[in-house]
């Protein structure tokens, strides 16, 4: 059995998401609104008929071969036949290996050998099967070669013509011959074959500027080129040419047997030869004109040769009436009319186009064609006539499906035909099936089973993947999850296997996340993934495994067989050009691109967009853009104020293009608030509270200044605390034997008038609360001090343990304290000139006279040792 090397495209037509692929050519513009576009210079990719079978004419008993070639190797070829003897009958598939038909296949070429018989005459079609997809060729006619005479084999009397020299003679010797195919002609004079002056005279002997040497007996013979049958016409012409001097003057006129007018039918593109009959004496001159065709004579394709007008590469616009005027100065002038018909084979200028259609929707497809005669339009749905479909209606050039059903999914072809041939174009019709809910039990009372709670949500599988070739070793898969209310999907896994015996499914390592639980279209949510490390020239199947939130999984249906062709066997796809990356928002950008030629749209099914942050060297994110007409696409969500790099490639059902050049773009920065906060008017002061965005968007220099100032303030505070602590530690420990209360009293001395101006006097007090546990000991110390009140106070010399520097420091502190007290005492006249307050008793402290106003307390330096005993009491609080 032949290996099914290319069951491609092979898309699951009921659920896959694809674009239309034409069989022959497709209009580059959208069919619904475009003017008649020019046809592309090369055929479109995908499934198409490269070479359709050609019509043949053959004699009975001959064997002919019909050939059909497709762009890709199908799973199988079939041929259908409609006999010419059964009018109105449909096509029937031929059984191969029979006596009258033998089918052979070699790769993507199929050959049908037919023995020409009466029952094998008729129309033939080639049908290629690509999985569920059926592509049908145009019709080839097999006709029987034949040659006959319209008037029978009756003998005609020879014509006798006598003309003066210098005239041109036209004899239509083969006007009664009917031949299929057109006969080839041979001309004879006096039994000797002569070469015609013009090619394409089609059974007309034309002699220009005759002389006496042209006299003789003329005859002609028709030969059927297919069968080789020859017909010797019985009629002949006896021509006698007389010298011009002997002829009398005579106006232009027609000879016996020459037609009064002519009607010629010619195929577009052929050469047309118009001959003007008539003679006169003297020989007339000929002038050509046409009331219907502007510039019919004076153009580059027309040439006047004597009495003949030759038009090369005939066009439809050349059809009309041509008049040749013959004038030799003798009235009347002879006018000869020739009616020209130019026929044109059918050509579809607006092919059908179908998008993904929901089951049950109404679909209207248009197919417009040109041709002369006006072509007839008919439709095939997966190889079956639309006339047999109850949902189909034909209206002028439209096919209307009132309700699209699943059986309509596949290839829809439009055919235009006239007697010159056929032309076809098609589109892929994809049907999105309705979601079928599980039927609920009806009738009776539903009793819940034990351990049965509320109805669980279903697991809706993804659609079968659509496969596109990326390279010789990789493909791109596209699938979607239809809208549903079932269990949410967490991730996808891709599985594939090579077609063949004992080939197991392989699972890729990548986990494809479902993303945000929202639908990105009315139909559902689309996904893409690539599969690498494949082998070219092998056939694969793919499927998608969905993992749900309940940790269960469900598989999609498998894709149709996909044959991975090497890139050398495919035509290159047009590469899109990225024009601009538009900053759409803080989380989105819009890509804008173009094609080198809009005529390339018919080659494209859609586009793949790849993007990643410019600072990243990881894999690209992918987005699929459906439709060949797209020129922009929004990509979201993205990071705010982030630079990304983008690239594009176009794809069809068979392959993908090269990547476009990389282009960078970024998302927008966060927008600052333009709303002012309410202000409180206080005179001319501006007390407007800055908004959050204004504070957040503070300039870096200002932020650095504020931060540096805060650090300096903290350093200053820390330094002051350290200095104060060191001074406090130095001042404690002057007298180790002095009680704590007495020490505090000695530390504060009265200064009568510290300030020279006494505008405001305040009484200040130091309130000391002692520990109750040390109250008795403190009272004993106070009584002891009271007994020593009358004794003179002597300053004890300072004693230091080991450091003489401490002694010098204490002496300096004492001298500074003395100078301070002297200045304070000098300002008070009641001190009797004694500024040395060191002789005061300890009882003169502020604790003894707390109510006396106008007193200022200053701390006195202690000269005792730094070690002090605080076990006698603890200081709880100090009040000023």
From Swiss-Prot:
Homodimer. Heterotetramer; 2 iHog chains bind 2 hh chains when facilitated by heparin, heparin is required to promote high-affinity interactions between hh and iHog. It comes from Drosophila yakuba (Fruit fly). Belongs to the immunoglobulin superfamily. IHOG family. Residues 426-467, 662-697, 728-762, 775-880 are annotated as: Disordered. Heparin binds at residues 497, 501, 503, 541. Keywords: Disulfide bond, Glycoprotein, Heparin-binding, Immunoglobulin domain, Membrane, Proteoglycan, Repeat, Signal, Transmembrane, Transmembrane helix. Mediates response to the active Hedgehog (Hh) protein signal in embryos, functioning upstream or at the level of patched (ptc). This is Interference hedgehog. It is a single-pass type I membrane protein.
């Amino acid at each position: 059995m032949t290996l099914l090397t290319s069951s491609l495209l092979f898309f699951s037509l009921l659920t896959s998401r694809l674009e239309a692929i034409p069989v022959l050519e497709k209009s580059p513009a959208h069919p619904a609104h475009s003017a008649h576009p020019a046809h592309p210079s090369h055929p479109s990719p995908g499934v198409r008929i490269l070479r359709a079978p050609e019509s043949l004419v053959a004699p009975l008993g001959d064997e002919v071969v019909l050939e059909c070639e497709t762009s890709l190797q199908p799973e199988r070829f079939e041929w259908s036949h409609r006999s010419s003897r059964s009018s109105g009958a449909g096509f029937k598939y031929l059984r191969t290996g029979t006596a009258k038909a033998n089918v052979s296949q070699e790769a993507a070429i199929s050959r049908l050998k037919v023995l020409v018989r009466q029952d094998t005459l008729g129309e033939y079609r080639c049908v290629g099967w690509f999985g569920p997809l059926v592509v049908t060729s145009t019709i080839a006619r097999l006709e029987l070669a034949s040659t006959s005479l319209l008037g029978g084999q009756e003998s005609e009397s020879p014509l006798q013509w006598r003309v003066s020299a210098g005239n041109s003679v036209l004899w239509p010797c083969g006007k009664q011959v009917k031949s299929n195919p057109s006969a080839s002609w041979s001309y004879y004079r006096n039994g000797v074959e002569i070469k015609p002056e013009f090619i394409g005279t089609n059974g007309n002997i034309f002699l220009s500027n005759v002389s006496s040497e042209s006299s003789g007996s003329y005859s002609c013979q028709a030969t059927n080129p297919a069968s080789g049958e020859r017909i010797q016409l019985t009629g002949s012409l006896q021509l006698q040419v007389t010298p011009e001097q002997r002829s009398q003057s005579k106006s232009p006129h027609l000879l016996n047997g020459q037609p009064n007018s002519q009607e010629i039918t010619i195929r577009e593109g052929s050469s047309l030869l118009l001959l003007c009959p008539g003679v006169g004496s003297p020989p007339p001159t000929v002038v050509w004109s046409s009331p219907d065709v502007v510039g019919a004579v004076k153009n580059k394709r027309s040439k006047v040769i004597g009495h003949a007008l030759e038009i090369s590469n005939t066009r439809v616009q050349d059809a009309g009436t041509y008049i040749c005027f013959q004038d030799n100065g003798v009235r009347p002038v002879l006018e000869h009319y020739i009616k020209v018909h130019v026929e044109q084979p059918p050509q579809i200028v607006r092919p059908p186009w179908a998008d993904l259609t929901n089951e049950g929707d109404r679909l209207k497809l248009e197919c417009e064609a040109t041709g002369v005669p006006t072509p007839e339009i008919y439709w095939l749905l997966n190889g079956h006539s639309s006339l047999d479909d109850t949902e189909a209606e034909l209206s002028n050039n439209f096919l209307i499906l009132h309700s699209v059903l699943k059986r309509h999914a596949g290839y829809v072809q439009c055919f235009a035909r006239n007697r010159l041939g056929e032309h076809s174009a098609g589109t892929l019709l994809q049907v999105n099936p309705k979601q079928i809910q599980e039927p609920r039990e009806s009738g009776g009372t539903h009793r819940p089973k034990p351990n049965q709670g509320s109805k669980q949500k279903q697991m809706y599988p993804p659609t079968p993947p659509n496969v596109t070739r990326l390279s010789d070793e990789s493909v791109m898969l596209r699938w979607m999850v239809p809208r549903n209310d079932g269990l949410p999907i967490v991730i996808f896994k891709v599985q594939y296997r090579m077609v063949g015996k004992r080939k197991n499914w392989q699972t890729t390592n990548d986990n494809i996340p479902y993303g945000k639980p929202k639908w990105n279209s009315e139909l559902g949510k689309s996904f893409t993934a690539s599969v690498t490390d494949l082998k070219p020239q092998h056939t694969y199947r793919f499927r998608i495994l969905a993992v749900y939130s309940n940790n269960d999984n469900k598989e999609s249906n498998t894709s149709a067989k996909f044959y991975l062709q090497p890139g050398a066997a495919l035509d290159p796809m047009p590469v899109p050009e990225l024009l601009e990356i538009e900053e759409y928002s803080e989380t989105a950008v819009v890509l804008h691109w173009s094609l080198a030629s809009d005529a390339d749209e018919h080659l494209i099914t859609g586009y793949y967009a790849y993007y990643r942050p410019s600072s990243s060297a990881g894999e690209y994110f992918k987005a699929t853009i459906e439709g060949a007409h797209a020129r922009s696409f929004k990509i979201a969500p993205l990071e705010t104020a982030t630079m990304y790099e983008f690239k594009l490639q176009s794809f069809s059902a068979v392959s993908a293009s090269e990547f476009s050049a990389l282009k960078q773009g970024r998302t927008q920065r966060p927008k600052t608030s333009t709303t002012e906060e309410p202000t409180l008017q206080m005179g001319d002061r501006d007390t407007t509270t800055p908004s959050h965005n204004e504070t957040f968007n503070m300039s870096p220099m200002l932020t650095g200044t504020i931060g540096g100032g805060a650090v300096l303030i903290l350093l200053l505070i820390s330094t002051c605390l350290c200095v104060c602590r060191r001074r406090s530690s130095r001042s404690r420990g002057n007298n180790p034997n002095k009680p704590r209360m007495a020490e505090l009293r000695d530390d504060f001395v009265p200064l009568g008038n510290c300030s020279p101006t006494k505008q405001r006097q305040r009484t200040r007090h130091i309130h000391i609360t002692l520990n109750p546990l040390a109250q008795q000991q403190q009272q004993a110390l106070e009584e002891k001090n009271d007994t020593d009140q009358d004794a003179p106070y002597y300053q004890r010399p300072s004693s230091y343990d080991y450091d003489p520097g401490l002694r010098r420091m204490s002496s300096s502190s004492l001298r500074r304290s003395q100078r301070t007290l002297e200045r304070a005492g000098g300002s008070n006249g009641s001190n009797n000139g004694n500024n040395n307050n060191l002789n005061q008793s300890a009882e003169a402290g502020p604790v003894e006279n707390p109510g006396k106003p106008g007193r200022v307390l200053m701390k006195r330096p202690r000269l005792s040792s730094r070690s002090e005993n605080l076990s006698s009491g603890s200081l709880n609080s100090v009040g000023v």
